[in-house]
Structures are given as C-alpha cells and as structure tokens.
Amino acid sequence: MPPRDYIIHPSEYDLEHVIADIHEIRRWNMQRFEMEQLTAIVHEDQSRGLCVGYKDITRDEFWVRGHFPVMPLMPGVMLCEAAAQLSSYYT
C-alpha cells in the first residue's frame, strides 16, 4: 500500500505552543474526570478546518490496567471520544 499524505504534517505544529490549556477547554467541553480526553490544543487553522490537540496519558488512566496489561493501548472508543471532544472544542 502506498504511503498516505498527512492531514497535517507534524512539522506544522508545536506541542509546546499551547493555544488552549485544560482550563480553556473546560469552558467549552462538559466532560470531566475520567472522561476528559484532551489536555491541550496546540494548533488551529480555520482556513483548512484543522485543529490539533493532545492528551497526556498516565499510568492512572482507568483503562490502562486492563487494556492491555502487558502493553497498555488506548482503546479505540477513547480515541473516538478524544476526536469528538476536539471537534466539540473547535466548533
């Protein structure tokens, strides 16, 4: 399979340049505690309809112990939730 183009290349954003921290995200998103899936927003490009955010993952996440014990992997449903929260913030 040929390589795919990036939606946004990692060189286009800086994870250290926080546009919105957790406190700003909370002004727009209602999720709290275990359901907060964003730590910060680091890039917005309204002309391209793009927004980049991230979540700091720790050993204390509720899913780490069981998904999967030897090699924790963020569950797909949590990835979808993170994308939904990013979309909710951006719109």
Residue spans of the language-model regions?
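Non-catalytic linker/capping segments at the edges of enzyme domains
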Residues: 1-73
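Active-site helix/loop of acyl-thioester processing domains in fatty-acid/polyketide metabolism
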Residues: 41, 73-91
